Amino acid sequence: MCVCIETLKSLNSNNQGLSSNEQAFGSPSNMNESMVFGSPSSSVLSSSFKGSNSTCATNKSASSAMFSRPFYYE
């Protein structure tokens, strides 16, 4: 959990528009996603979660984003 919170804090420091997304990542299912999106590029994905109150919709947008733009950790 601490790792997830630190990730959200780092994202907020990089993009001021992500403050509202902390609520979106508040659910258990989204906590796991936030760890997957632990790369700098996650700020781009997180912006797509803004205004999405439905966990289902959030999961779909996250999945489509992953398939269209996969992450490679080096």
From Swiss-Prot:
Name this polypeptide is given: Putative uncharacterized protein DDB_G0274507
Species for this entry: Dictyostelium discoideum
